[in-house]
Amino acid sequence: MLTVTTLVQLMKRTLAVGAVALAAVSLQPGTATAGPAPVVGGTRAAQGEFPFMVRLSMGCGGALYTQQIVLTAAHCVSGSGNNTSITATAGVVDLNSSSAIKVKSTKVLQAPGYNGKGKDWALIKLAKPINLPTLKIADTKAYDNGTFTVAGWGAAREGGGQQRYLLKANVPFVSDASCQSSYGSDLVPSEEICAGLPQGGVDTCQGDSGGPMFRRDNNNAWIQVGIVSWGEGCARPNYPGVYTEVSTFAAAIKSAAAGM
C-alpha cells in the first residue's frame, strides 16, 4: 500500500517525463497520478480571459511573470542552466489554434535548494518577449485567503488526458491546520498554501503543475498567490490541492528574474 509520503513523491502535478526531479518511482500509464493536472470540475475559459496563462511543452502550466520570463513549478524542470528544449505556448485558450504564440526557452532557473519538498518554483526565460499582459505576484500574505481561481490545460478528471481548451475553476482557501490534518508532515506550511472544497469535486490535476492560483487584489487586478504543486489524487474529499505560497518566495523570485 502506498503511504502518503510515497504518494507525495508521485503526485507532483506534472506529466513531464524526466522533469519530476524528485520522483524515485516511474509511473506506468494508468497508474496513480503523476502528471500535469487539468482542472477538475472546471469550465472553459473565454479567449483573452487569462492572457498571462502559458502552456509549457513538458506538460506543465505557467504564467508570464514578465513578457520574457515564465513562472512555473520547480518540479517541472530538471535543473538550472541554459535550456532551449522547452516551448511556451501563449495567447490562446485552444492549444490547436493557429493564433497561438510559440516561443522557445533559452534558460531555466530552478529554485535554489529545491529537493522535492517545498520551494517548488522555477523561472524560464524565453528567446523573445511575448506581448501579452503579465501576472503580478503577491509579496504579502494579505491575499492568502478567500476564494482563488485556478486555470490549466491539465486533466479534467483523475487519470484523464490533457485538455485542448483552457479550463478554469474557483477553490476556497484551506487553513494550514486543516491541510496538515490531511497531509501531516508532508506539508510545509511556511512555504505552501492549500485550497479546495471539503467534499472535493474541484481541483487542479495532472498537467496543471506550475500554473498559477490567483485572485483579485484591492485594485481588482489579478494577483498570483500560488503555483500548482501537488496533492493526493485530484479533487478527492478532504485532500485539498497544495500550492507553492508565492508571497514567501516573492523576493527570491524577483531577484532571480533580475539575474536572468
Curated annotation (Swiss-Prot):
UniProt family annotation: Belongs to the peptidase S1 family.
A GO molecular function held by the record: serine-type endopeptidase activity
EC number: 3.4.21.-
Protein name: Trypsin-like protease
Residues at the active site: H75 (charge relay system), D120 (charge relay system), S209 (charge relay system)
Matches recorded under SMART domains: Tryp_SPc (SM00020)
Prosequence residues removed at maturation: 35-38
Function: Involved in mycelium differentiation.
Cysteine disulfide partners in this protein: C60-C76, C179-C194, C205-C234
UniProt xrefs under InterPro entries: Peptidase_S1_PA (IPR009003), Peptidase_S1_PA_chymotrypsin (IPR043504), Peptidase_S1A (IPR001314), Trypsin_dom (IPR001254), TRYPSIN_HIS (IPR018114), TRYPSIN_SER (IPR033116)
Gene Ontology biological process terms in this record: proteolysis
Peptidase S1 domain residues: 39-258
PROSITE patterns: TRYPSIN_DOM, TRYPSIN_HIS, TRYPSIN_SER
Keywords, in A-Z order: Disulfide bond, Hydrolase, Protease, Serine protease, Signal, Zymogen
Signal peptide from the UniProt entry: 1-34
Cited Pfam families: Trypsin
